[in-house]
Design a protein with these regions (language model features):
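Bacterial N-terminal signal peptides
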Residues: 2-14
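Signal peptide processing junction and immediate N-terminal pro/mature segment
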Residues: 14-21
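Sequence context surrounding c-type heme c attachment/ligation sites in exported
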Residues: 21-53, 64-142
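A Trp-anchored, charged/polar loop motif used as the substrate-binding/catalytic surface
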Residues: 61
Length: 142
């Protein structure tokens, strides 16, 4: 959802004309606009696993490029996961990796109604991503 906030001052009172958020409800603000970030994958893909934690049609976006073999601190990687036939702009799952102080933080969200809620996070995600250590714990390659 794209946001525009317009405020008009009228005789010492403010009137909000339109308010919306640039983040889908429930997703962290640091993922704002992720669908406009460069994609890591060339085209949507369905390949998964084993084991398969993210089944569906996937696109992977990163806000920063690798520096050598590693992603820099502050990198956010978002994997949007839609089921076949669903709108890619409204994925039913969103997996997020965020690099802080040299370590990845993981969290996966599930669409529940009009809001994303936490599905999995932390060690559960990290144990699987350990298999991609050679690519800085990221399975998808450019």
């Amino acid at each position: 959802m794209v946001a525009i906030v317009i405020v008009a001052a009228v005789a010492s009172s403010a009137v909000v004309v339109a308010v919306a958020s640039t983040t889908a409800a429930g997703l962290p603000s640091y993922t704002n606009g992720y669908q406009k970030w460069p994609k890591i994958n060339k085209k949507p893909f369905t390949k998964c696993g084993p084991p398969c934690a993210h089944g569906g049609v996937k696109n992977v976006y990163a806000n920063k490029k690798k520096v050598g073999a590693r992603y820099p601190n502050g990198t956010v990687i978002v994997k949007s996961i839609a089921q076949a036939g669903d709108k890619p702009s409204r994925p039913n799952q969103v997996a997020v990796m965020r690099k802080v102080a040299g370590r990845w933080k993981y969290i996966e969200y599930q669409l529940s109604g009009s809001r994303y809620t936490v599905l999995a996070q932390g060690q559960l995600c990290q144990s699987c991503h350990a298999r991609a250590k050679a690519n800085d714990y990221v399975f998808t390659k450019r």
